[in-house]
Amino acid sequence: MSKRQSAKYKLDRRMGENIWGRPKSPVNRREYGPGQHGQRRKGKLSDFGQQLRAKQKLKGYYGDLSEKQFRRIYDEANRRKGETTENLIGLLESRLDAIVFRAKFVPTPFAARQFVNHGHVKVNGRRVNIPSYRCKPGDVIEVREKSKQLTVVLESVALAERDVPDYIEVDHNKMTAKYVRMPALADVPYAVHMEPNLVIEYYSR
């Protein structure tokens, strides 16, 4: 198992949940955290503990964003009109790597970040290699022609492990995706229950 895979599944074990709904997740076999003390029964979390856990889970879901990156997104969500909770989710889902993942061009957010970094994606006909690139409604994302035969792409497109949400229109034959609109929390097909309201409470302390 690669270091990246190990880190990904470590998050699953720490949270005790199959964060991305992957069939190979170790929590499908056990329900305790990583390490020799992982089997000890956990006590009830304090309010702060619940808030921290919610933040770590949401931050980790999107390829384990750095605290600086995640805080910057929260700050923007907080400045925007409307509910900060909905703004936060909408901004996270408008990242280029998130859309590549949702479109099923690759199997995980980690793979999506690497895929974009390596220059396999174009937005509106132009090559973009920045995972955090903010997509706007109407933007067309496509896999570059020479990248369409990569094993990771072919295998991900062939598998039906998750549905493509309706805020993205995908043509898997052409390997293109149109970002239709910024989604609300209820639109996002998380494999586990997310609590962005607790994330807001964490940063509002």
UniProtKB/Swiss-Prot annotation:
Entry coiled-coil feature ranges: none
Single GO biological process annotation from the record: translation
Region called Disordered, residue ranges: 1-49
Record key words, sorted: Ribonucleoprotein, Ribosomal protein, RNA-binding, rRNA-binding
UniProt key word Ribonucleoprotein: yes
UniProt domain S4 RNA-binding: residue ranges: 94-157
InterPro entries: Ribosomal_uS4, Ribosomal_uS4_bac-type, Ribosomal_uS4_CS, Ribosomal_uS4_N, S4_RNA-bd, S4_RNA-bd_sf
CDD domains, sorted: S4 (cd00165)
Annotated SUPFAM superfamilies: Alpha-L RNA-binding motif
Family: Belongs to the universal ribosomal protein uS4 family.
Protein name, entry field: Small ribosomal subunit protein uS4
Lineage: Bacteria, Pseudomonadati, Pseudomonadota, Alphaproteobacteria, Hyphomicrobiales
Name of the gene: rpsD
